[in-house]
């Protein structure tokens, strides 16, 4: 995951964030106040497109701490196909819960 996080951060023009992977009950990922990223260990069961989307989403939060239009424009710039990954996460995410 670290090479993916580093490459997305470089494309976003931000410093590569610290990465932690742990079991989270309610979230797939989050961006910490100190610009670190925490990803849910359950993502390891998800397709690569979904993992990439979550990394892109959280890296975008380093620059945009909201879900306004500018945030989504950055997500789309970094991953034009993000809507498909988001759909997969919403429809199929239950399958990756153990």
Where are these regions (language model features)?
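Walker B catalytic acidic pair
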Residues: 58
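Active-site-proximal or metal-binding-adjacent scaffold patches in catalytic folds
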Residues: 1-53, 62-98
